[in-house]
Amino acid sequence: MIFDGTEKIIGHGAQAEVYLWKGFAYKVFRPDYPAEWIAFEIDQQKAVNALGLCPVRYEKTEDAHTIKMDFVDGIMLEERLNGGYKDGFADLAAAHRFVHSVEAAGTIPNLRESFTSAINSFSLPGITDAQKRRALEIVNAIPEEKRVCHLDLHLQNLMFLKDSKDAFPYVIIDWVNAREGNPIFDYARVFVIFKEFAPFIIDFFMGAIKDDLNKLQSKDAFHDAVGVCALLRLTEHNSDAVRQIVKEYLG
């Protein structure tokens, strides 16, 4: 992507940097990042738009490694919490309920199929075949549902709109992981991220989602789902903390 020098970097991650330029956000991926994965992310966002879950539009550009996006002029829920906001975890729980209230109707990939494929192709030193078999058993044992699962809905992916007049003044971003399936995996995924990076907030999160979890499954099912999500987390972030979660929850 060729900018004119007026662009401003507003975000960065392992795979891409995000720039603000002429009123739009531009996600610029590393040159070696597969173009077909970027095309999938655009298609995924269009599906989410159609389901009414997020108004942010993605568009292709002349550069296959750059996505043009609507700019969300807001602050992360994480920033609100750091500023002393007291209801952040209640808001995070409400965001999950909103996502799970929508049926995917086959418009996004199936969670069970995606997880099964990922586990079958999984290969990392120290991860045993027994752990993989156990993860596959769990994925197939937890009942399938047709609900949308974001699978990355943590404090940095919930944007507060300062000037919004809506009762729920947030926009949920970063939908590339979204799948159609059982919401218990959505909660388990966030639990793993918090346990890895901020274990001191787990009690706040679990307190906020307690009633929602009770409506879904037993405590054992959540425990099992955490093991699966931890195993898959290793494909993104192969850390000692995540390996410990795998050992604790999958054996």
Segment roles from a protein language model:
Residues 49-62:
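Conserved HxN/HPN-centered segment at the entrance to the catalytic loop
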Residues 180-182, 188-251:
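Helix-rich C-terminal or lid/interface subdomains of diverse kinases
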Residues 157-187:
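Catalytic activation segment of kinase domains across protein kinase-like and atypical kinase folds
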Residues 63-76:
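Conserved short submotifs of the Hanks-type protein kinase catalytic core
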Residues 101-151, 155, 159-164, 171:
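An alpha-helical support segment within catalytic cores of ATP-dependent transferases
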Residues 5-39, 46, 78-80:
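ATP-binding glycine-rich loop module of kinase domains
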Residues 83-112:
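Internal "kinase-insert"/substrate-recognition segments embedded within catalytic cores
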